[in-house]
Amino acid sequence: MSEIVNCLIIGSGPAGFTAAIYAARANLSPVLYEGVLPGGQLTTTAEIENFPGYPDGVSGSDMMEDLRKQAARFGTDIRFGIVTEADLKGDLKRVVVDGEKEVLAKTVIIATGASARYLGLPDEAKYAGEGVSACATCDGFFYRKKTVAVVGGGDTACADALYLAGLCKKVYLVVRKPFLRASKIMQERTLNHENIEVLFEHEVVGLDGDNGVAGASLLIRRGQPDEAAGHIDIDGLFLAIGHQPNTKVFAGQVDLDAEGYIKTENGSPLTNLPGVFAAGDVADPVYRQAITAAASGCKAALEAERFLLTME
């Protein structure tokens, strides 16, 4: 016989654990499945200094462990497992964990996050948290007065380059195309900044360094009859080539936008399906901060509580 739970939370980042804290305190007896990366993306961040309550900063893994303990303290049933199937359209939502265990839920909070798109280099995993980052506002502070590179050509890449230019000695903006895709004003600010050097028609194809990133190998197309090799000395590499929301298992059920993010109603966690709520980066293509994810997790739990009251 399948297990039936009041509130099923899928994902264990700031959104998922905050939802769990609020749901547990409301006596909803939440069950949380941690997913592929327990603790979410923040576990790969060396230090967080912009989350309230940590005046001396905290490592991403330590902060997520604090949130996990707090959720467990109030009675959240935290389980390791990956949701591999989902049918969310009925009164009881059905999910399958790890391809075998079936769980039925009266409410579901989707907090599966969004994964940064990476370049696919063999060395990226090696340098994760040691010089490769997908969040300039999270990690840029640690590269003060150093040299870094940003990969990308859109608004996010330009914004990251401008942000880092205020901290770093030098910023390379590595762009595959011969032009920027960013808005005109962002292009102007980026191209005119004295600390930013834009490398058009360049592509990062390798990383090197014994203790963290020390350099990047480049493939150069600009001004070359054939592709040429190049190299830049850098202390960090920031990726700004987009994020991929982790919504594949929910496609065809919850409404998604063109990029795959879950559509919600007017800034709330409400989705198109009654009893199904979305929180954190999985529904946020704009801010993608730990504090905004936590706030949306709180809202999702409150909405789940209200929904369950209407079912009584």
What are the functions of these language-model segments?
Residues 71-97, 102-105, 166-266, 306-312:
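A Rossmann-like FAD-binding core segment of flavoenzymes
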Residues 4-6, 80, 144-146, 201, ...:
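Phosphate-coordination loops involved in phosphoryl transfer and adenosine-cofactor binding
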Residues 292-308:
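An active-site-proximal "capping" alpha-helix that borders the catalytic cofactor pocket
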Residues 78-144:
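Glycine/small-residue-rich loop that forms an oxyanion/phosphate-binding "nest" at active or ligand-binding sites
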Residues 3-74, 147, 152, 158-184, ...:
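Beta1-alpha1 glycine-rich phosphate/pyrophosphate-binding loop at the start
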Residues 20-21, 44, 120-123, 161-163, ...:
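Short amphipathic alpha-helical segments
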Residues 120, 126-142, 241-287, 296, ...:
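FAD-site-proximal beta/loop scaffold in flavoenzymes
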